[in-house]
Design a protein with these regions (language model features):
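Hydrophobic secondary-structure block in the mid-to-C-terminal portion of proteins
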Residues: 136-142
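N-terminal short leaders/motifs
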Residues: 1-10, 38-40, 45, 85-94
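Extreme N-terminal tail/first-helix region
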Residues: 1-32
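Short hydrophobic/aromatic beta-strand or adjacent loop that forms the aromatic wall/cage
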Residues: 33, 132-134
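Short, structured beta-strand-loop surface elements
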Residues: 66-121, 127-131, 139
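Short coil/turn segments at secondary-structure boundaries
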Residues: 28-31, 125-129
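Short beta-strand segments
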Residues: 30-66
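Short strand-connecting beta-turns/loops that link adjacent beta-strands
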Residues: 56-58, 93, 142
């Protein structure tokens, strides 16, 4: 069995779900992972993505739509751009949330905070001409 540090994509999601995040929440270099549940904009099917996150206040979390610095945004970002009502799972806590792109005023500080936990985001931004967005996931009532 591989360690959570080696996990990517579907195997990461599977282990996270099977263990309520006991295996998969803690990842590389002290980063923590949440699961983002979106509705596929074309298929309508549930999509689940493991993402590095950081808390933003009491009831919100931030993630970065980097896709490794490619010129195309990740599918999960396109999905939530079409349907911002999502679900988030942090360890065993799964809850509804509303996704929004950080405002121009918020972006610099939130970007700085995210690069503190994953410095590679700065390299990703240098690789692309698109502004890599920080996404705020705000907990909502069920």
């Amino acid at each position: 069995m591989s360690s959570a540090l080696d996990l990517h994509g579907p195997p990461h999601v599977d282990r996270y779900l099977e263990t309520n995040g006991e295996d998969g929440y803690n990842w590389r270099n002290g980063t923590t992972i949440l699961l983002l549940f979106t509705k596929g904009r074309k298929s309508g099917e549930e999509r689940i993505n493991p993402l590095i996150f950081r808390d933003h206040g009491d009831d919100a979390h931030t993630v970065v739509a980097s896709r490794g610095g490619t010129d195309e945004p990740p599918s999960w970002f396109l999905n939530l751009s079409e349907e911002p009502n999502v679900e988030v799972q942090i360890k065993g806590d799964r809850f509804p949330a509303r996704a929004r792109v950080a405002t121009d005023a918020e972006q610099p500080e939130l970007w700085k905070r995210m690069t503190e936990v994953w410095p590679d985001y700065d390299q990703y931004q240098q690789k692309t001409s698109r502004q890599i967005p920080v996404v705020v996931l705000e907990r909502t009532k069920a």
